[in-house]
Amino acid sequence: MPSVNIDLQAHPNLQFRIDCFTVPAASRPDFEAAMHRNLAFIETLQGFEGHVVFEKTAGPSAFDVVTIGVWESPEAVAAAGEKVRAHYQSIGFDMPAMLARWGVTAALGFYNAPPAMQ
């Protein structure tokens, strides 16, 4: 079970990768397998603090899976992005094409937690 401790006062530069997905039931096993493979690689990267996956249980949102990855700083995110792109290229993985093939829709982005908004 993942553990993520978010102490914004002690770590004000934390960066959050929040990805929201709508996953057709028929594609769910392939999607989950790819998600686990991706996480196994990301966990090896410097500055990665943790990851949590949420599954919708109620409400009007179109998204049924939400993932949140926590990074120690904007610099860690930038370095990780380069390594992830290189890794995907080395294994011939095309994320947008794979999501399209599975019929998955996604909203992806990086976020911070501005102190003035807390």
Where are these regions (language model features)?
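Short glycine/proline-enriched loop/turn "hinge" motifs that connect secondary-structure elements
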Residues: 7-11, 58-59
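Short, surface-exposed ligand-recognition loops at beta-strand->loop->(often short) alpha-helix junctions
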Residues: 22-34
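Short amphipathic
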Residues: 18-20, 105-112
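Short, well-ordered beta-strand segments in beta-rich or mixed alpha/beta enzyme
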Residues: 15-22, 51-84
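An amphipathic, aromatic/His-enriched active-site/gating alpha helix that lines ligand/cofactor pockets
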Residues: 2-3, 9-10, 37-49, 70-108, ...
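Short acidic/polar alpha-helix capping motifs at helix-coil junctions
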Residues: 2-5, 17, 30
